Amino acid sequence: MALATIVILETSALVVQMEVITRIRSWLFNHALPVWTEKCMDSRFGGPVESFSLDGDRPFTDAYKRTFVVARQLYVMSHASLLGEKKAGPLADALFEYLRKVCWRGPESGWVHKVTLEGDILDPTADLYDFAFCVFALSWYYRLTENSDALTLVHQTLDIVGRDFAHPSGNGYYNQLPANLPRQQNPHMHLMEGLLAFWEVTNDSRAKDMSNGLAALFRRQLFDKAAGAMPEFFDDFLNPIADSTRNHIEAGHQFEWAWILARHQQLSGQDHTDIVRTLVLNAERFGLHETRGWTMNSNKLDTSSQDRGSRTW
């Protein structure tokens, strides 16, 4: 009887899972991608459109383009093409050309943060968040095309990260150059996401080593075991800032780290089951709106709600 109950529950869960996957795939291919492949590119200045009005019909007249937005769109079109979206491949090619020709300053300086519509440098800041998304997007584009220029750009980007962003203590990386405070967990998270994508497609030894180092850093420094949560901001030694007016928790980032660590477990064989479970269960406990069900933007350090709004990411 108990075994039959387990089988029924597992079968029901599988049916629900397949229904969710079907709904997501339908939304992606029948609604999102048809709009995005038609409207994502800036026909006047090149590169992607930065933002749309709420009706999805009129792009805002933003006076800039940010490197990480270009990279995110390159990832979307690369992955979409791999999933069979026919219009996405040429868009990925165009986005790759824009990224490397407009946003890249060369192997000594790397990626700029922001350019004008005309493609001139507007903000030359070297930001690890941008570098991380470029590693991620270029890895996916290489997976799609095996373009050797994309491979070279990833290696050159990681050269800069290792040479210029690495903290002298060996504990993680600076957010930006020149270095500033507070230090943040978020660029580390997205860097690991990019490294895992590069590791998976190339089996690159440096991507393995850096990913393993970031997984260890998360367990050792970024995750607060006592609270079962992860603060966003840290001092120069990666001690969490205790002032609740200057720090907070984001459940969305806990969900992201859970996925990243689960993926690292698949690639490395290291067991993160305990911390993945803790991240998800605690984020669901304190980070979901009690009636709407959405992931709230932020919580205070004691996990009480702070910003009850939600972003779609």
Protein language model annotation of sequence segments:
Residues A2-W313:
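Glycan-recognition and catalytic cores of secretory/periplasmic carbohydrate-active enzymes
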